[in-house]
């Protein structure tokens, strides 16, 4: 797809419209990120950008390699769910990272990605967003973005991490399947204005690069503090579905590895490393945690 150009007699030419298709040269900031964008792989169609990034990482792709696709035929969500990925309307991207950290700290990079997405939405588009643990970015309670991180590691070190990000930018109502598990939206549906996908990608990669540099230099605490400022769980009673059953309690923050903490009526907070928040309600007063299922 080419650029639309008008010829003006005795003057020259002017650009009327740029193509909607993404261009690998236009998705990175003018000031190249320090770590992200060492390689950019732009695909017209793929099954999953995470699968592509994983393959590249195993083949030795350098840290900061980016995969970005116009559409996915099998976009991946958490727990085997499918990320709906129509062509030419959203952002589907995965990034290869090789942080010198133990596996226990890897969840912090999922939180970092959520913070970067929320910042772009608010600061570039003027929309208040929030983050739902562990990986959803919401607008007015509806999911607008998700993050899926996958890791190759040994007991004491990470070989590489693939951070996949999907952001609903220009989807219309009819593009969403009717049987979605959770309500979803797009920036277009919220604002009524079409989003420049390349511009969104440039801003996101720049913010991801800065946050990643902060994480490597200062550890996870700045990431955790930023995530808590964006989270939608403050003063909420949560019900969380885990592999061992359901746990409920008052949101008590995150630990230093990004695990969810639920207050337990005076005892040490319950620590949840993986699960889905399936219910949330305002809590005027403390209630004890109830646990269903094994430990």
What do these predicted ranges mean?
Residues 1-122, 143, 195, 292-295:
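N-terminal lobe of the biotin/lipoate ligase/transferase fold
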């Amino acid at each position: 797809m080419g650029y639309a150009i008008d010829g003006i007699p005795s003057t020259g030419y002017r650009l009327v419209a740029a193509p909607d298709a993404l261009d690998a040269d236009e998705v990175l900031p003018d000031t190249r990120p320090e770590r992200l964008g060492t390689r950019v792989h732009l695909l017209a169609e793929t099954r999953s950008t995470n699968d592509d990034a994983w393959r590249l990482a195993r083949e030795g792709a350098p840290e900061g390699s980016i995969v970005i696709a116009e559409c996915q035929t099998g976009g991946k969500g958490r727990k085997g769910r499918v990320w709906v990925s129509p062509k030419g309307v959203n952002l589907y991207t995965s990034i290869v990272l090789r942080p010198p950290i133990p596996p226990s700290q890897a969840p912090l990079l999922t939180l970092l990605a959520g913070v970067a997405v929320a910042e772009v939405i608010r600061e570039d588009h003027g929309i208040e967003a929030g983050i739902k643990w562990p990986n959803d970015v919401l607008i007015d309670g509806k999911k607008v973005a998700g993050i899926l991180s996958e890791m190759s590691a040994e007991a004491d070190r990470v070989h590489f991490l693939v951070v996949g990000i999907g952001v609903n930018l220009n989807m219309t109502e009819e593009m969403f399947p009717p049987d979605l598990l959770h309500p979803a939206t797009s920036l277009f549906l919220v604002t009524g204005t079409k989003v420049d996908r390349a511009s969104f990608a440039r801003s996101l990669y720049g913010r991801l690069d800065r946050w990643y540099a902060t994480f490597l230099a200062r550890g996870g605490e700045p990431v955790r503090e930023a995530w808590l400022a964006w989270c939608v769980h403050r003063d909420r009673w949560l019900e969380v579905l885990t592999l061992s059953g359901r746990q409920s309690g008052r949101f008590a923050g995150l630990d230093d590895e990004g695990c969810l903490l639920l207050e337990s009526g005076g005892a040490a907070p319950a620590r949840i490393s993986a699960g889905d928040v399936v219910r949330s309600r305002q809590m005027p007063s403390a209630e004890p945690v109830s646990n269903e299922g094994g430990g």
